């Protein structure tokens, strides 16, 4: 909108556009907003600049585009946010993944000395091992939605810090399994509580990111910190060799040192998060966790709220930039129900079900699949061949996600990645040579990499525009919670859980079908997004229309001299 109106005949303009005569409009609203009359008593709007009260249509203002200088400022602002936010989230997710992966490593650490978790755990049996693995997902799924919804009530960075803190505490408590108090029942309980502690982390991180970046800038950045999982898988294997050297030090087994050290590091990082991550813009209904805890005055000086991040000018620009994501809108419980019943959520769940199920199935049984491809491979060979598959996964993320953010072709990039997975599964199943089949595993890893970040970014952007905070929190929790049932299917019903499939080829065929389901669900999601079918209107949208009518009137005013602007 121009700051100064063109020098045209005001009389003719009023005659040609009688509905655009602001004095008449102001008279109709002067009873409720007397101050508006003084601001607009001499202003006439040209219909080429603005469409206001036109033939009874809803009041709208043409969206103000960013100027070239503002676009350059936005680039610098996003870089500033990247440098502050991404490293913290990457380290956070890396440490949480390390604590998750260390449990499986403890089964084989220091086996020659008889000091592995399996060898030292009282009452151990294969039944308890499977039960512990299953209950991890049960705890994760049950508490996923309530944990993520807490971010709509409590400042997100505080809740993320709480999640990481409990992950570190429960992870460190696994060291108890090597003492006289440890037994199979305590192992099962700790696995369950680790799932409860981790619930809400992955969707919570995506929710937090959606409060800082628009949907078109979200996918690449989710992919950046998602690479922490792949790096963690390789890192814990290498670092575990060092922990095995510590076996017997101060009377502790090697795996006990591993649990303790990773847990303490995670706890330390969790305590730094409130000062490291910037606070999300919020309304008065969101409370800080510290507001419920009485603190002495000297501690208030160390409050995270006192740590500055954005300048007032940056905050103003960011507010305009992030407006389409409906950050901080006041919502009602009916909006939560609407977001859960929105038809778009359920295709996302099926998309996530297929890709995460196949991903966890392949990666959990990857060493066994490599061994089946060539039984002559030694244990060291298998370990060395396992790492490149994770690296291929990370390569897929850093290669595809920048292109995804650049071209915004959600359906094309997701289905393209899924087709690479299907091709990889087919090669791993039916290629005549062992190394060709191993190449199929690399293809699977590359294709799987970008699928989860695309799914999360797409869901965040779609639901934020319709339901705001509560829509993002609830939908991401449902997608990751129910979608992780795919992991249960592939982990326990396929591969080693399928007695009639010793070569794993039937399991790979089922995985191809699961990826096919993800592709079909992606097509349905694309159509629902385009047509708007199955969506509901959030309660805050009705309130916003009333507010916008008043806000537009305050925005439409003639340019004032600098002295008068200062008074205003």
UniProtKB/Swiss-Prot annotation:
MF (Gene Ontology): biotin transmembrane transporter activity; dethiobiotin transmembrane transporter activity; solute:proton symporter activity
Principal localisation: membrane
Gene3D superfamilies recorded: MFS general substrate transporter like domains (1.20.1250.20)
Stored CDD domains: MFS_FEN2_like
Record Pfam families: MFS_1 (PF07690)
Keyword terms, alphabetized: Biotin, Membrane, Symport, Transmembrane, Transmembrane helix, Transport
Protein's UniProt keywords contain Transmembrane helix: yes
Entry superkingdom: Eukaryota
Protein's name according to its UniProt entry: Vitamin H transporter 1
Species of the source: Schizosaccharomyces pombe (strain 972 / ATCC 24843)
